[in-house]
Amino acid sequence: MESRPREITTNQLGVHEDLTCIVNKYRQSEFKKPIAVHTKEAFQQVIDWLGDWQGDVIIDACCGVGESSIVLAQQYPNAMIIGIDKSVARLDKYAYYKRQQTDKSVNKRVDRGIENVKVFQADLNDFWRLVANYSATAQWKISKQCLFYPNPYPKKSQVQKRWHASPAFVALLTCSRRIEVRSNWLTYLEEFQQALQLHDVKSFIQEVSGAPITPFERKYTESGQQCWQLQTHAEGEER
């Protein structure tokens, strides 16, 4: 019998009061942390896999077991999907999720000939910087980035571990400003939205609808928890 997923427990009320200061600090400074060798190698594997591709590329960041990467590959058959996660243990489960097939009318996962998706083990702090530096000369373009249920680090003292309050956020936005983030902690998305605003990026937040696309989302919705999504506006779009 599976245990009920825990709801977010936090000692933080609302958007962190230091968020603006933190985001602005990283906007005005350079992220100088050395890039790990294993992520450089993973990035080269991505380049090799894409080969002479000249179309859209979608990054599924924090992809976990890669179920969402497979869903994205089905939703965007004319794009190449790159799933990135730091955990080898999670990525080892990818083959299982890619093999699974169901006939549910609202959640059909048929794995016939899905060749436009691959997952890689890498540190996103480094991977985003490598993509940002390479993208100016790349034949392909990052058309969208997805962060589905990233670790929310809900303790107030952990704010700078959240992606939008980390030094990697600048590189993330350099890769692509078309972003979708999902979480079962609304405050996480409200903070992400505020960080985007500080970079002049507009976004909106709404409840998640439709079939679950990750194991976490499935567990949350089945236990009655509300899930939320943030999406940025396309350039020139208003809502």
Predicted segments, located by residue:
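Class I SAM-dependent methyltransferase "Motif I" SAM/SAH-binding loop
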Residues: 62-66
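Charged helix-capping and loop-helix junction motifs
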Residues: 160-168
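Class I S-adenosyl-L-methionine
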Residues: 188-195, 199-239
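Conserved beta-strand/loop positions that form the S-adenosyl-L-methionine
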Residues: 61, 84
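S-adenosyl-L-methionine
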Residues: 1-57, 67-75, 98-138
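Conserved SAM/SAH-binding beta-strand->alpha-helix loop
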Residues: 87
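Conserved SAM-binding loop
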Residues: 94
